[in-house]
């Protein structure tokens, strides 16, 4: 956002975000760093975390409308890469479609290397929570629907960029299973998706490039694949200075 048109023009905005860390056994210093214009990490936030503090919330997740599927179950989550695929834009009557789509995309995932030869190192979970309405928002067509994760096309001004700013709903739904990576499976025929490194990625289910889209967006969110779209527009401007070598592969 900061390098997009609004951010560059001084329009400020806040984003709800989450950091996932192992539960500490003792007090720790929690530090956040960000890269400066020279691509060097600089500390910008620090706090102490005491796992025994009375202010550590220990709520248990509970929602009778949520159903969990396990299309790939290879054992102890502590020893596997755990991927959760969240349902978005599926109504209660479309649960079977979610399951069919889930199994189809899991199949696509393991057609590709290095995942194909490492399948035993993964667990994949599907988490279904019905939306009130089917699909996702299309602001350019004046279409807005009521869905669980509030995804939308035209994110950050890019027509094909399909994302959500509702981090809280996404994390609350993902919390029903162990996870290292989050996919949002959006029930829609239009081509679109997105991926943010160490955050989440999205993809639509029913377009002709769905197989490519599924693995491509995972590359952005899980393996740090860089944006190098010199043939098409992106949602930001001059993210890297010409004199700086990106760290992304």
In which residue ranges do the predicted regions lie?
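Short pre-active-site segment immediately N-terminal to the catalytic Zn-binding motif
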Residues: 97-98, 193-217
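Fold-level signature of zinc-dependent metallopeptidase catalytic domains
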Residues: 60-111, 126-134
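Beta-strand-enriched, solvent-exposed domains that form extended recognition/catalytic surfaces
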Residues: 1-61
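Catalytic Zn2+-binding segment of zinc metalloproteases
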Residues: 218-234
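Active-site-proximal segments of metallohydrolase catalytic domains
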Residues: 121-197
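Structural recognition of the beta-strand scaffold that forms the well-ordered cores
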Residues: 82-86, 123-126, 181-185, 213-214, ...
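Solvent-exposed loop/turn segments at secondary-structure junctions
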Residues: 89-92, 130-134, 188-192, 208-210, ...
